[in-house]
Amino acid sequence: MKSAPRIFIFGLAAVFALSSCGSNDGAGSGSDSPEVVTPAIWSLTGLAGPDDAQLKPIVVVKVENNSIVRPQTGLDHADLIFEELVEGGASRFAAVFQSDIPDEVGPVRSVRHVDVSLASPIADIFVFSGGAKKTMKYLGLELPTAVSQVTEGAPGMNRKPGVSAPNNLFLDTKQMLAAVAQSDTPSSGFFVPAPVSAASPAPSSSASAGPAPVGKAVSTVEVAFSTLAEPNWKWNATDKLWMRSEGTKPFTNKDGSLFGTNNLVIIEIREVDAGYKGSTGGYVPRSVTSGSGRAWVLSNGKAVEVKWNKPTV
């Protein structure tokens, strides 16, 4: 059975990045002199991996969450998934892959301002279909130039016949990774913006002091982004997973199995006007991931309220 994503991060308004930790199997040195050895663990989960685990690329992919595209392809392979509010009251995912990159991910959709703050600290490759002019300009200014951008028109970005646009764009990860590895200018596609200035520094983190709090027992979690996006989670003590539903309908993987995750993080942040209209002329929200606020970390059937703080986007 496929292991579930380690962390699923979402918010009452949008999202903010946190990390998880776990066991590791770092090998010791065989020499007489002490030697620093890179632990054989995956960067995003902290779980044991191959010796070169931390050298594997981290790929962030924007994925649609409209009801007509479910079940999506590849989400159950992600190490980390962000959920964010977009126009029309719908939500979308930024799925992050490293330890288990599937052959296909999709449907791939467009970028938003908030994705820069999500991808910048962690991504080697950022995959999205395209974006509004203001968003693409912001991306060119703020996303680190070391992050390869892959958009429609790039190798591995394919439109599926028989599937209605715009939800027919899917990522062939093997084709994309091969193209990025072989390219001197790995960003590719129709909509890659030219970088305009140096990117903002990625936020730093510090280890917390003291023992971890015990937390309060929780059996269900209900989140309302809008009347259209109301994800619910129920703790499954047998499988040790939070199982997702969309309203009253179970959220499933492509093979029909139920979608679950080990950990949930709920972030309370602000939404402001992005300054442009969507394709249907409606308001486009912009999630603000700088500042501070409340958050809830849920794991092993328990919830702990915490405070988040992030000085810059």
For the regions a language model picked out, list residue spans one by one.
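C-terminal motif of bacterial Sec signal peptides marking the signal peptidase cleavage site
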Residues: 17-20
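Bacterial N-terminal signal peptides that target proteins for export
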Residues: 1-8
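N-terminal, intrinsically disordered, polar/charged segments of Gram-positive cell-envelope systems
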Residues: 28-40
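Bacterial signal peptide processing site
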Residues: 22-25
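A surface/extracellular/periplasmic glyco- and lipid-processing/surface-interacting theme
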Residues: 38-56, 60-78, 87-313
